[in-house]
């Protein structure tokens, strides 16, 4: 295993994840039961390794430039059921069991509004009380 690649097993063939020039890949989190897309974030090799070791979703924050465990502050965690790679191995999919809302705005999914700004889902928690 190299610093810029993390491998995973699929059908007994190792898949080498193709991290971009910043050392990241997009990671889509999807509810394993409902199929709802919850969020898109970025993953570094370390975040992917930690996710595989712990069974809890870890990501890399581009704004804070640090590794973070989903739910570390809010308690709204993502338990990993399966990790998949796309056909080009440059995007990954976390199939998760979501505890609480996935979005820091209080919604179940980060995709809670249309392009014209209409909110199509209700909040599942109050972010002001969670992120005091």
Curated annotation (Swiss-Prot):
Its cofactor is Mg(2+); Zn(2+). It holds the Pfam family PRA-CH. GO terms for biological process: L-histidine biosynthetic process. Keywords: Amino-acid biosynthesis, Cytoplasm, Histidine biosynthesis, Hydrolase, Magnesium, Metal-binding, Zinc. Mg(2+) binds at residues 86, 88, 90. It is found in: Cytoplasm. GO terms for cellular component: cytoplasm. Binds 1 Mg(2+) ion per subunit. GO terms for molecular function: magnesium ion binding; phosphoribosyl-AMP cyclohydrolase activity; zinc ion binding. It is an enzyme of class 3 (hydrolase). Its EC number is 3.5.4.19. The keyword Ligase does not apply. Pathway: Amino-acid biosynthesis; L-histidine biosynthesis; L-histidine from 5-phospho-alpha-D-ribose 1-diphosphate: step 3/9. It catalyses: 1-(5-phospho-beta-D-ribosyl)-5'-AMP + H2O = 1-(5-phospho-beta-D-ribosyl)-5-[(5-phospho-beta-D-ribosylamino)methylideneamino]imidazole-4-carboxamide. Zn(2+) binds at residues 87, 103, 110. Belongs to the PRA-CH family. NCBIfam families: PRK00051.1. Homodimer. Catalyzes the hydrolysis of the adenine ring of phosphoribosyl-AMP. HAMAP family: HisI (MF_01021). This is Phosphoribosyl-AMP cyclohydrolase. It comes from Haloquadratum walsbyi (strain DSM 16790 / HBSQ001). The gene is hisI.
């Amino acid at each position: 295993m190299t610093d810029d690649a993390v491998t995973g097993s699929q059908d007994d063939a190792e898949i080498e994840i193709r991290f971009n020039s910043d050392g990241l890949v997009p990671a889509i989190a999807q509810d394993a039961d409902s199929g709802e897309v919850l969020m898109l974030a970025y993953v570094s090799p370390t975040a992917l390794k930690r996710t595989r070791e712990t069974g809890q979703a870890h990501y890399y924050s581009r704004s804070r430039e640090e590794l973070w465990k989903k739910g570390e502050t809010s308690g709204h965690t993502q338990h990993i059921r399966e990790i998949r790679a796309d056909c080009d191995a440059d995007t990954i999919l976390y199939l998760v069991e979501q505890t609480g809302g996935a979005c820091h705005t209080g919604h179940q999914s980060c995709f809670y509004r249309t392009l014209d700004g209409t909110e199509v889902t209700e909040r599942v928690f109050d972010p002001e009380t969670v992120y005091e």
